[in-house]
Amino acid sequence: MLSTSSDSHYQLKIASFNLFNFIAPPDAFYEFDNIYTQEQWQKKLNWIAKYLNEHQPDVIAFQEVFSPDELETLTKACGLDYFSVLDSPQVMDDFIYSKPVVALASRYPIKEAVSVSADKEWAAQMGLVSEFEFSRKPLRATVDLPKLGLCDCYVVHFKSKRALFDAQDIKANSATSSFRKSPAGTELNTGQLLAMEALGRWGSSVQRGSEAALLRYAMVERRSQTQNPMILMGDFNDILSDGVLAALTSVDTRIKPQADMSQGAMGDIAHQLGFYRLQDSYDLYQASQYSLSEQARPATHYYFAKGSVLDYILLSSEFDAKNDLSLAEVGRYETYDRHLINPSFEHDSQSTDHAPVMITLAIRE
């Protein structure tokens, strides 16, 4: 909730939370036997509620939502009176679901909510099929935030690193690839399997990177029309500094904007570029007066023993203290990872495989 700090700044908490297969029984996720017992489901609900009640986010993005009605009930019970979800998970077979969706909950009014679609013309220009779609539709919710006014909050869950296809997919598809043009009964050799695996993984990277680039274009289009501050939250399924996601934050350009003094500060070239820029909230925190020390960034996901930061909150120039038009700055950055690095079966067995991330914004008077 909105609070006042000792230095006369108002504080607002923004979070992102991958729920990890949030689906109410008796429905199943992906396979017919992936069904929570009532005890497991209640334990999962309690774990999420405990996080929400302890950390008190004002706006929170959710990923991996199969049961949006149950999530809305839970978040409203925790004081988040406004909720938005627009897409629906895919029904594979009766009670078996795939393709979970994203959602957003807020303490403050959601004035508008839309699903973001890929621009078909730009997708074609990029060499993609004109019917290109996001693997999971991003959500844009315009929230009326105290002291800030209308703010466009985007929730994403980009394509995972899981290969788009594997050898079994190729064998099952009668219309594909020269790899199958071998004598009947001949197995694919190791080299062919390795090459196919590389193709499948690169296919996922192309999808993920294209989603990032097309989302940024959609955000810039919206920003041009409304000038609303922007917050992008979600599970990126990749490292932000990796080239695949560079389109989200890159300001490298050959474009030389024309200065227009009649537009005041916005006529300045640096301000024109900065106005459409997104920055990692962690970097903004590290550069702020509130940063305590330079520390290694905590991972938000572990694959065996290897940790990676996959969950992010990106912010527009209004949240950059060094920007002349700044309205707020990042006063705190938190990664809730206790259940990942020191789990307790009693408390964490139905938690999540990601660490929720949360920032505290110090809003100027």
What are these regions (language model features)?
Residues 1-4, 115, 124-127, 131-134, ...:
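Metal-dependent phosphoester-hydrolase catalytic domains
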Residues 80-92, 174-182, 256-257:
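Acidic, His- and aromatic-enriched active-site or binding-groove loops in soluble protein domains
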Residues 20-42, 162-204:
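Acidic/histidine-rich helix-loop elements
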Residues 1-82, 87-102, 187-191, 212, ...:
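N-terminal, active-site-proximal structural segment of metallo-dependent hydrolase catalytic domains
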Residues 5-14, 134-193:
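Beta-strand-turn-beta hairpins that frame and shape the catalytic cleft
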Residues 182-189, 196, 204, 208-232:
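His/acidic metal-ligating clusters that form di-metal
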Residues 65-166:
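Structured beta-strand-rich core segments of catalytic domains in phosphoester-bond hydrolases
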Residues 34-38, 57-62, 198-206, 232, ...:
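Second-shell loop/turn segments in exported
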